[in-house]
Amino acid sequence: MGARASVLRGDKLDTWESIRLKSRGRKKYLIKHLVWAGSELQRFAMNPGLMENVEGCWKIILQLQPSVDIGSPEIISLFNTICVLYCVHAGERVQDTEEAVKIVKMKLTVQKNNSTATSSGQRQNAGEKEETVPPSGNTGNTGRATETPSGSRLYPVITDAQGVARHQPISPRTLNAWVRVIEEKGFNPEVIPMFSALSEGATPYDLNSMLNAVGEHQAAMQMLKEVINEEAAEWDRAHPAHAGPQQAGMLREPTGADIAGTTSTLQEQVLWMTTPQAQGGVPVGDIYKRWIILGLNKLVRMYSPVSILDIKQGPKEPFRDYVDRFYKTIRAEQASQPVKTWMTETLLVQNANPDCKHILKALGQGATLEEMLTACQGVGGPSHKAKILAEAMASATAGGVNMLQGGKRPPLKKGQLQCFNCGKVGHTARNCRAPRKKGCWRCGQEGHQMKDCTTRNNSTGVNFLGKRTPLWGCRPGNFVQNTPEKGKAQEQETAQTPVVPTAPPLEMTMKGGFSLKSIFGSDQ
């Protein structure tokens, strides 16, 4: 820690600790920031000792600058810290990190302009003049390697300091990425844009290297070769060979086999791609790339036979997942862009589930995809399911209560109270001004409660529902109930039928008086 923190001493350390991290912030740079920068440089396989002087900081800046735009926040923070350290070593007075970064970027721009002017002068002295080749085909590429502001072409065809175009082989990392995509994705629709990105500006030699690197799916590779052969034969029919002698200074016109890299050398391919079309140049790399993409489209249709008409949203599927499947399938459809636009506007709403379809139709025809996703965000999710279940249970509960109460009462608004004494809305039974209902559950009369009731006649007893019941309760429903009507009918039948005695009268039984002889025998 001490070695990394010792890159600044004395006045430079005081200047370092006076610079703010942000333009309007209170925090300032400390020694721990130097220690962190040294650790990050060592993690990125760079020498932390370069932080001790201006030249070393500038080398670090040149190394980190290309990665700032696409790098992680750690790389950006490291670049900003090194910029501040460079200004401290160079004696530049800065107040915060933003000013230091502006100064460094300004110096980088000046250095880049100087190198551009130097290389332009060298090209003028050498008498080299290059023309821009217009785009060809549907790929939108120029048919030659992309040129930088300094005039040097980028990978895979680059231009050295002498202005000579030479080929740089495709990197193993690119081949590994392509093979991994084929192994993981197969021939899904996303393979085509991945191939187009990895083969940007490639020569037919590089494209054949990418195809030969695929170990699996040899049947698909054979079908791809058949498509390439058909396109090559069509090229030969459209561009027959000239019978006359070749003009001086003009390149020979490539055949279909030359474009496919079968009968042409790498040097000829580079010349065709770098020579202007007025002098016989042909963008063989872009043409061959277009043929391969046609074959990949055929493989995608065969390996992904799902039609866009079969993509429908499930009853419980979130709308976002349905949209992902829809656009993934329409990406593989071999149709023009207007047809795909019509499919998107029509089928996306038509194949949605009833809940989402009801919401999407309410949005109208001109709704954007963002508005659709926002409107259908909760449909199909746990919250939407809970809401539907709560509504169903609420309706079922309300129906059950109405059935038990024998009628449908007017619904109460939220926050309203209902009195249990008078049945009116707006107060409770405690604050009710109406006379309180009092009555005995046994006899049904007001003025006393059941515990004070003196009535013992079961025929007049009532329960709390107002129905008459015996004092000891009533029988279950599956037993024969003794109602007052049945008791009266039995009394009438008894009165009409004469009673015939079956024993002698009581007077004859008591005629002899009372005696215990029959009990104790003859001991009396």
Curated annotation (Swiss-Prot):
Residues 113-125, 135-151 have a biased composition (Polar residues). GO terms for molecular function: RNA binding; structural molecule activity; zinc ion binding. InterPro entries: Gag_p24_C (IPR045345), Lentvrl_matrix_N (IPR000071), Matrix_HIV/RSV_N (IPR012344), Primate_lentivir_Gag_pol-like (IPR050195), Retrov_capsid_C (IPR008916), Retrov_capsid_N (IPR008919), Retrovr_matrix (IPR010999), Znf_CCHC (IPR001878). Coiled coil: none annotated. The keyword Transcription does not apply. Capsid protein p24 is phosphorylated. Specific enzymatic cleavages by the viral protease yield mature proteins. The polyprotein is cleaved during and after budding, this process is termed maturation. SUPFAM superfamilies: Retroviral matrix proteins (SSF47836), Retrovirus capsid dimerization domain-like (SSF47353), Retrovirus capsid protein, N-terminal core domain (SSF47943), Retrovirus zinc finger-like domains (SSF57756). Residues 113-153 are annotated as: Disordered. This is Gag polyprotein. It comes from Simian immunodeficiency virus (isolate TAN1). The gene is gag.
